[in-house]
Swiss-Prot record:
Top-rank taxon: Bacteria
Subcellular location: Cell membrane
Membrane topology, as annotated: Multi-pass membrane protein
Regions crossing the membrane: 3-23, 35-55, 63-83
Protein name per Swiss-Prot or TrEMBL: Uncharacterized protein MG131 homolog
UniProt entry tagged with the keyword Transmembrane: yes
Keywords, sorted A to Z: Cell membrane, Membrane, Transmembrane, Transmembrane helix
Source organism: Mycoplasma pneumoniae (strain ATCC 29342 / M129 / Subtype 1) (Mycoplasmoides pneumoniae)
Main location: membrane
One Gene Ontology term, aspect cellular component: plasma membrane
Amino acid sequence: MQYTVLIPLFIFIGAMVLFGFSFQKKQPQRRIVQILFLAYCVDFLALIIAVMMLTFLSYDDLMLGVLIPVLILSIIMFFVMIIAHYPLMKRLFGH
């Protein structure tokens, strides 16, 4: 039961891997946007699961040691994804 707290960590790592795929060369812009959207969704899923586990499960050192960094890194990664591909997003969505 105590290792269920690793689930958000692995989901977050999956979001980071997807974000890394968005930097591959010679990809069409549409493909980059699809990868980024999937990375946003996976990152948000890790954030939601971590918040739910912190809210509804009892606390121990492993849980706090894994879930709090996942929460912080997930929020930071959300903004990093926006900033890293800002020129592409600005060109696609205008303004």
